[in-house]
């Protein structure tokens, strides 16, 4: 069996609400930490989400 190319990551809200998304990324092509703007329903606005490890 070969090692999986995609890994699951957790996108944590920078608004410190504790809200997060779980998504996948290709660790070979995207070596830097992922940052994206998504909707945070707790803060009720779009904020940046930064990559963190899934525990």
From Swiss-Prot:
It holds the Pfam family Ribosomal_L33. Transmembrane segments: none annotated. PROSITE patterns: RIBOSOMAL_L33. The keyword Calcium does not apply. It comes from the Bacteria. The keyword tRNA-binding does not apply. One of its GO terms (molecular function) is structural constituent of ribosome. One of its GO terms (cellular component) is cytosolic large ribosomal subunit. InterPro entries: Ribosomal_bL33, Ribosomal_bL33_CS, Ribosomal_bL33_sf, Ribosomal_zn-bd. One of its GO terms (biological process) is translation. Keywords: Ribonucleoprotein, Ribosomal protein. Belongs to the bacterial ribosomal protein bL33 family. This is Large ribosomal subunit protein bL33.
